[in-house]
Amino acid sequence: MITEERILTVLRAPHISEKATMAAESANTIVFKVAITATKREIKAAVEKLFEVEVKSVNTLVAKGKTKSQGARQGRRSDWKKAYVILKEGQDIDFAGSAE
C-alpha cells in the first residue's frame, strides 16, 4: 500500500504548540507537520504503520509562510502542511517511550 520510504517522507515531525497540546489532552488528537504533497490516505497509513495505532480520521491544512525582512531585503518562508490525526478510542501515541 505505502512504501517504507514514503512513510518516512510523509511525516516530518510532531507539531508542538499550545493548541496541539490541548487537542491531545481533550480530543485524542495528534498534530504532525507533513509533506506538502501528502494526502490524507497516505498520512493515515503512515501513522498506523509507524506507531501501530488505529486512526479515526485526518484533517489537513496548509499554513502559509510568513513574510520576513532583514534590513532592506524581504523574503518569505515556505508554506507547510499540518495534519490533525484523530485516534480511535483507547489508542495513544507515546513519543517519549515507555520508561521501565
From Swiss-Prot:
Q: Name one GO cellular component term.
A: ribosome
One MF annotation (Gene Ontology) recorded for this entry: structural constituent of ribosome
rRNA-binding recorded as keyword: yes
Provide the alphabetized UniProt keywords.
Answer: Ribonucleoprotein, Ribosomal protein, RNA-binding, rRNA-binding
Q: Does the keyword Ribonucleoprotein apply?
A: yes
For the biological process aspect of GO, one term held by this record is: translation
Explain the purpose of this protein: One of the early assembly proteins it binds 23S rRNA. One of the proteins that surrounds the polypeptide exit tunnel on the outside of the ribosome. Forms the main docking site for trigger factor binding to the ribosome.
NCBIfam families named among the record's database cross-references: PRK05738.1-1, PRK05738.1-3, PRK05738.2-4
Subunit text:
Part of the 50S ribosomal subunit. Contacts protein L29, and trigger factor when it is bound to the ribosome.
Q: Of which family is this protein a member? A: Belongs to the universal ribosomal protein uL23 family.
UniProt name for this protein: Large ribosomal subunit protein uL23
Organism source for this protein?
Answer: Photobacterium profundum (strain SS9)
Gene (name only): rplW
